[in-house]
UniProtKB/Swiss-Prot annotation:
Keywords: Competence, Cytoplasm, DNA-binding. GO terms for biological process: establishment of competence for transformation. Induction: Expression activated by ComK. GO terms for molecular function: DNA/DNA annealing activity. Belongs to the DprA/Smf family. It is found in: Cytoplasm. Interacts with RecA. Interacts with ComFA and ComFC. Its main location: cytoplasm. Disruption phenotype: Transformation efficiency drops 50- to 100-fold. It comes from Bacillus subtilis (strain 168). GO terms for cellular component: cytoplasm. It holds the Pfam family DNA_processg_A. Protein that helps load RecA onto ssDNA during transformation. Binds cooperatively to circular ssDNA, is able to bridge different segments of DNA. Favors the loading of RecA onto SsbA- or SsbB-coated ssDNA and formation of RecA-DNA filaments. RecA-ATP cannot catalyze homologous DNA strand exchange; SsbA and DprA activate strand exchange by RecA-ATP. This is DNA processing protein DprA.
Amino acid sequence: MDQAAVCLTICRINQLLSPSLLLKWWKADPSMSLTSPVLQTVTRDQIKAAALKNEIEQFYPKLPRVLAAYREQGINTIPISSKQYPFWLKSIYDPPAVLFAKGDMTLLSKGRKIGIVGTRNPTAYGKQVVNHLTKEICRKGWVIVSGLASGIDGMSHAASIKAKGRTIGVIAGGFQHIYPRENLQLADHMAKHHILLSEHPPETKPQKWHFPMRNRIISGLSEGVIVVQGKEKSGSLITAYQALEQGREVFAVPGSLFDPYAGGPIKLIQQGAKAIWSAEDIFEELPERNVQYTEPF
């Protein structure tokens, strides 16, 4: 059983292993064999190891049929061993074992990428900022990465399209369960002309814990993350902190002291994020460079 097949199988049986444990397995045994000692090492439990081996062996014969069905739906499967796997994402501590992709695959390897995240309830100022920054960023040929959520995320994708730029949407569930439904038309357009990504099989319904998992992919794909509006406990700050852990730059758009949605960016600036007033501030902080990283495998 090759590495890619094992990763795909594990994802399809609902990820019995977390990304970090799957990486541990791959490091312990590059062949990813199903021997009991190896499985017990990564699951830390004899019963769990036996259950995992049983599920993999039951599902593995079905894998070719499942992958064929995905291809018919226009869905590409990209295991971490693939050359198509995004360079930047592969460098983080816990990259997804497999990416499911729908759209223009060339966007994974071409163009510098910047993430934009923020509140689901932007003010008129927030909308103006997104349109202004996105237009400037796209003019430089950068690719906008966001989470297809309501508010700032969806607006970032739409503004990229309007500016004739390119954009990547990272969703929390599978392609059969786009959330929120209000962005379904936007998602359909992106799947045809840009690209959508998920670490979950297409039939996976989004769960609460999938959203912070999704956020690490947004930041992992990007050289930096811009936070446009968000309260102090906003989910967009989770993305910002994950970006910092991944060694990415964090940018924050200042707002009014009397606006609760300025609380998140102000907090980030106090903690060392770079306050930005234009896209030029981003370009100055992220000059052309050759990034070195160590492969996780």
